[in-house]
Amino acid sequence: MKLVIASDIHGAADACARLMSAIEAESPDRVVLLGDLLYHGPRNDLPKDYAPKRVIEMLNSIADRVIAVRGNCEAEVDQMVLKFPCMADHNVLLDSGAEGGPYTLFLTHGHVYGPGYHNSVDSWPALPPRSALVYGHTHIKVSEKDAEHGAWVFNPGSAGIPKDGSASYGVYESGRFEHRML
């Protein structure tokens, strides 16, 4: 199973267009969106390319491949305009074909469940062996094993408002995660 994983677009249309090009080039089975898709929120500056209607159009064009979770900036109106479910706090994917056996991905934004890194909440869900906690929210890329919990921790960074210098997304394939720049 191949996934493109993105988070924190925040209505940035040019960034979303670059992400759409990356999705086309990667040709994933599914696209995972970890929240904060349309609104920039009260703590972030307005992205220079802020155009949520364009972002809606782009994301709706791939609705049949999207698995999304709610970020702290999502509102019920977002669900009214997006053609895929986006209001759950988490989702769980099982990659039964992963190298070495089944692999569980716990998908969340980082404000309800998270590893406690940067400004994510420190609230770990119960995870089986061979798991990853995949989250967004911080706008900072992370890919490392958490020694205390024994799970892989992955944050794709932010597509729209990066706080670590570069817009990015992630790719998951057969139990491995990678960051890619936009």
Regions found by a protein language model. Give the residues of each.
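Core catalytic region of metal-dependent phosphoesterases/phosphodiesterases
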Residues: K2-S96
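Active-site neighborhood of phospho(di)ester-bond hydrolases with catalytic His/Asp-centered motifs
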Residues: I5-S7, V31-D36, V66-N72, F106-H109, ...
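Active-site-proximal segments of metal-dependent phosphoesterases and phosphodiesterases across multiple
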Residues: P42-P52, V81-L127, G160-G165
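Short C-terminal domain-edge/linker segments immediately following a structured domain
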Residues: L34-L38, A63-D64, G97-T104, G136-V142, ...
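Beta-strand-turn-beta hairpins that frame and shape the catalytic cleft
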Residues: M1-L3, L93-F106, D146-V153, S174-E178
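Conserved beta-sheet core of the metallophosphoesterase superfamily
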Residues: F84, H111-L182
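Short, well-ordered coil/turn elements that cap or connect secondary structure elements
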Residues: S61-A63, A88, G100-P102, P128, ...
